[in-house]
């Protein structure tokens, strides 16, 4: 029986398909084009915090966030479906793609939300959600973003250690391909306000600068 908490390797991952997922491009909440690239002066980053429904809502509510979408990244399968990701055979984690204006919302402030609003010490799970698709992750799009993310990890790890918490397991690395999730999942909690939200946290605040 497949253990969904063990990462599949590239040789054993599902192949996927060449055809990209067709998604509704208009953001259900703010009307932005979720398929658009970051424009000059904007940045993008990918956050994995467990189930992407609650994580996306966290970020679209922030001033300075231009657009959000949910999808799959960090694995091997081309253009996976949700069912394939749930199988544990794609290597992908559920992520939120955040496009933001760093002049309004610096990356450091986004990262504070990231660290505080989920438990980054749980490995291949988040709360009761088990599997590699729920692992904590930050996928960056520049050397500067990577440096800031790694520095924030060190700062939050120190705060966790002071409270006798476990070690951070968050995967932090340059972003690979991002594959949009099905339209059903985009802005899910705006369409289904009583839907499941698995966001939690350790209760440890990010230390002040």
Curated annotation (Swiss-Prot):
Disulfide bonds: none annotated. It catalyses: L-methionyl-[protein] + [thioredoxin]-disulfide + H2O = L-methionyl-(S)-S-oxide-[protein] + [thioredoxin]-dithiol; [thioredoxin]-disulfide + L-methionine + H2O = L-methionine (S)-S-oxide + [thioredoxin]-dithiol. It comes from the Bacteria. InterPro entries: Met_Sox_Rdtase_MsrA_dom (IPR002569), Met_Sox_Rdtase_MsrA_sf (IPR036509), MsrA_MetSO_reductase (IPR050162). GO terms for biological process: cellular response to oxidative stress; protein modification process. Its EC number is 1.8.4.11. Keywords: Oxidoreductase. GO terms for molecular function: L-methionine-(S)-S-oxide reductase activity; peptide-methionine (S)-S-oxide reductase activity. GO terms for cellular component: cytoplasm. The active site is at 51. It is an enzyme of class 1 (oxidoreductase). NCBIfam families: msrA (TIGR00401). Belongs to the MsrA Met sulfoxide reductase family. Has an important function as a repair enzyme for proteins that have been inactivated by oxidation. Catalyzes the reversible oxidation-reduction of methionine sulfoxide in proteins to methionine. This is Peptide methionine sulfoxide reductase MsrA. The lineage of its organism: Bacteria, Pseudomonadati, Pseudomonadota, Gammaproteobacteria, Vibrionales.
